[in-house]
Curated annotation (Swiss-Prot):
Gene name for this UniProt entry: MRPL4
Keywords assigned: Mitochondrion, Ribonucleoprotein, Ribosomal protein, Transit peptide
Localization per Swiss-Prot or TrEMBL: Mitochondrion
Keyword Cytoplasm: no
Gene3D superfamilies: 6.10.140.1190, 6.10.330.20
The protein's name: Large ribosomal subunit protein uL29m
Length: 340
């Protein structure tokens, strides 16, 4: 809008504070009474660093900025490859981080002496650093050896596993009933050794299901069915005649139920009874392409249920109903239920 130049135009008023002026303008009483103290000169004594501060990891135990090079033991030597081969993975992991921490301390001390223009006198830090570094190189060498050995075993393992399975099959299926308990332990060792999977859900913590685990479940279920399905129940009827003679194990869910069964006639009969109830509910069979995901879910579910059940037994109280136990607890834990 253009201001009019006409003499009769209304003069625009200017906004002014009323009198007296507000306190925010005249001054604040709190500010007037505030007394400024003399500044505190910076000093090292005024700085407190907690012992848990992570930067202390770059210092030695006595928290000196630089250690005396004469304190280094020149008679020490790096760990040899032969010595490290006898160490476990946990020991190698711990030793690696001890060496890494020591190298960081030595590099810090070397850098400090260089800044102080003593670079011609810090050879001790460099030589000690090289000794620690040689140990770390040897650790990597040992780990590389183990990895190459693992890769080579993976190439021949299927053939070795097939041969071991063939030898164990005949022994397991044809043995007398008096060896049931012994065969149960042998089957457990066989599955863990060649497949890395156990019939005890508690031992499968952290297991990632893959094709090898699927094969282990199928193999264990097949052996138990072949050994005990020809037995008879208390009425003299074959336990295999529980409604599915032609399809004993239809999908991975039924195979896992048989895999968890106790190595006894009663255990297999109980698993067959569960499978019969499952089929009578008319579910859709688990597709082969979905077997890994379904089995992973079953393993985690049974592992959690077994942990709850073991805790209940430990505390001598069971808050689970009978139906919950039958649905969630693996068969090998049912015989642990307290009898009245």
């Amino acid at each position: 809008m253009i201001r009019s130049l006409h003499t009769s135009a209304v003069r625009q008023g200017r906004k002014k504070w009323p009198k007296p002026l507000p306190g925010s303008v005249t001054g604040n009483e709190f500010v007037k009474k505030l007394e400024l103290k003399a500044p505190i000169a910076p000093a090292l004594d005024n700085i407190e660093v907690p012992d848990s501060h992570p930067l202390w990891q770059f210092f030695c135990k006595d928290k000196k900025i630089v250690r005396d090079q004469r304190s280094f033991d020149s008679s020490t030597r790096p760990w040899s490859v032969a010595e490290l081969r006898r160490k476990s993975f946990e020991d190698l992991h711990a030793l690696w981080y001890v060496c890494l921490k020591e190298r960081n301390i030595l590099l810090k001390e070397e850098r400090v002496t260089t800044r102080m223009h003593f670079e011609n006198q810090n050879g001790g830090y460099r030589s000690e650093h090289d000794r620690v570094g040689e140990t770390m190189v040897n650790i990597r060498h040992v780990l590389a050896e183990r990895y190459r050995a693992f890769e080579e075993v993976q190439q021949v393992l299927p053939e070795v596993r097939a041969q071991a399975n063939a030898e164990f099959d005949e022994k397991y299926v044809t043995a007398d009933a008096v060896y049931d308990s012994e065969l149960s332990l042998e089957l457990e060792r066989h599955l863990v050794a060649y497949y890395g999977f156990s019939t005890d859900p508690r031992a499968n913590a952290g297991v990632q299901v893959d094709e090898k685990i699927i094969e282990a479940v199928k193999y264990g279920a097949k052996l138990k069915y072949e050994r005990y399905s020809g037995a008879t129940d208390e009425n003299g009827n074959p336990i295999a005649n529980h409604g599915f003679v032609h399809q004993p194990k239809r999908d991975i869910f039924e195979q896992y139920l048989m895999f968890l069964a106790n190595d006894t006639t009663e255990g297999v009969a109980e698993a067959l009874s569960y499978i019969k109830q499952y089929r009578e509910s008319n579910p859709l069979p688990v597709a082969p392409w979905n077997a890994i995901r379904v089995l992973q879910h079953l393993v985690e579910e049974k592992m959690g249920a077994a942990a709850v059940f073991e805790e209940a037994l430990k505390n001598k109280k069971l808050d689970l109903s009978e139906q919950d136990i039958l649905e969630n607890i693996p068969a090998q834990f049912l015989n642990k239920l307290p009898k009245e």
